[in-house]
A protein has these predicted regions:
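Pol beta-like nucleotidyltransferase catalytic core
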Residues: 21-25, 67, 71-137
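A short acidic (Asp/Glu
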Residues: 59-62, 84-85
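Short low-complexity, flexible loop/linker segments enriched in glycine and/or proline
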Residues: 12-16, 64, 87-90
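Nucleotide-sugar donor-binding catalytic core of glycosyltransferases
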Residues: 1-55, 59, 75-79, 122-137
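Conserved donor-binding/catalytic loop of nucleotide-activated donor transferases
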Residues: 42-44, 64-69
Length: 137
């Protein structure tokens, strides 16, 4: 598990009874480099995303998981509003009572349309941003 800082780790450990018995060695405090992250996605079938409770938008992990064509389990219910949402590939669980049906993990990833993948490529995002700008000259 990753924490942005040791201070956050200790704060969460004090606040969350489930972390009280955890060892600091079980956590990372530096982000993975690009190659390590890609290798981790390559080896994974399913990715878990636990977003901040007040966050409504998606984490980068959600976008990366779609791009990696891996299944996603997330605590963010807003993911159901996105065009790439497919209940076969993405499971939004209740933060307080996360239930993951066995069938979700056992079923294969279902491809989504190439057009949807294209919408989330960085070059497409940049084109969308720059095409929407109005230049005064």
């Amino acid at each position: 598990m990753f924490f942005q800082s040791r201070i956050l780790y200790y704060k969460m450990k004090l606040q969350n009874k489930n972390l009280r018995g955890a060892s600091i060695r079980d956590f990372r405090f530096t982000p993975l480099d690009k190659n390590s992250l890609l290798e981790l996605y390559r080896k994974s079938r399913t990715v878990i995303d636990i977003q901040h409770p007040k966050q409504t938008g998606l984490t980068m992990r959600c976008i990366e998981t779609v791009g990696a064509k891996r299944k996603l389990i997330t605590t963010n219910p807003h993911i159901k509003e996105y065009d790439f949402y497919d209940e076969n590939n993405i499971l939004a669980v209740n933060r307080e009572n996360p239930i993951v049906p066995t069938g979700f993990l056992e079923s294969p990833y279902r491809e989504i349309s190439a057009e949807v993948y294209e919408n989330y490529r960085i070059d497409h995002w940049l084109k969308t941003i720059f095409d929407s700008w109005v230049f005064p000259w």
